[in-house]
Amino acid sequence: MADTEKNLVIFDTDPGIDDAMALLFLKAQPSLKLAAVTTVFGNAETEVTTRNALYLTQRFGIDVPVYAGATRPLTIERGPAPAFIHGEDGLGDVGATQSFAVRPAEGHAADRMVEIIKANPGRVTILAVAPLTNLALALDRDPGIASLVKDVVIMGGAFAWGGRRGNATPVAEANVHNDPHAADRVFTADWPVTAIGLDVTSHCVATHDDAAQLASGGEAGRFLWDISRGYEDLYRRRNQVDGCCLHDVAAAAYLVAPELFALRSGAVRVVTEGIAIGQSIQKLDGHIFGPSAWDGHSSKLVAGEADYAGIVEAYKTAIRSLG
């Protein structure tokens, strides 16, 4: 397939173990072309996530510019990075990026996002698997990009459609909770958004045996095995899961296999203060209430359920194909 026929993707990310899984999944997709990798705080500080993105793209031969982005939320204070999940270095503390030092491409992620979208109207999908600060900043820089983007696909939110609520708090998913004001800005902008939240991603489990089989199949699988030993152990202890959830991979899978997802349509708002800060709430189309904060905002799509086994199989097929 010629590059001009491929779907262009800006991957907004905070690598992150499952971010690394998603990036390698994207590399394996012949119908996609990465236009940029943009980084943000989240699983680690922006300096660390940027280094990790540069390391991953160089190690696995992914020819794409990496642009560093926001280092803190729009309004609230930055919370501590979850080193207990992803390690101090964001990639499992196995020493993968030790002594690695490469500078990102020039320019702020939000500015480059705007430029790429304006240069390719109707062709660019933003895949955001991190706090949504870069996207909110891009909208502030040029609101006109909302009418030019093809789609915005988010790994974020917890809407309770699948019985799952938060992982950062009892009601808030981590990416949205890290910058709730940015998330509300993104969900209320007049552009297409599809959210693949914990309702789906927490059911997409690559088992220990899946990871072991991929590790025996080539460098990509072995690398993912190495960085995810502590990650997998955390899932076992905290969630009683034999393996780990493919949060970011599930959102990436939507780009190439949307038929695996059942979507619900309706306006989405995010709580930006109080005990429920970071909670994402969808008002379904056709449900009639009195005047509310959802009024006047365009509908967004939220995944309520999916073919979980199909998503896991797509991931395994992708990683095996990389050798």
Give the ranges of each region predicted by the language model.
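Conformational coupling and interaction surfaces
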Residues: 2-6, 25-26, 33-34, 174-177, ...
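Metal-dependent C-N hydrolase catalytic cores
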Residues: 7, 50-119, 297-310, 316-320
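Short, glycine/acidic-enriched capping/hinge loops at junctions between secondary-structure elements
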Residues: 21-23, 48-49, 77-79, 281-283, ...
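Short secondary-structure boundary/hinge segments and terminal tails
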Residues: 44-45, 74-77, 204-205
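A residue-level signal for conserved active-site and pocket-lining positions in enzyme catalytic cores
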Residues: 66, 186, 252
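Short, well-ordered secondary-structure micro-motifs
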Residues: 77-79, 163-165, 206-208
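Short, surface-exposed amphipathic charged segments that create phosphate/polyanion-binding patches used
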Residues: 80-87, 166-170, 211
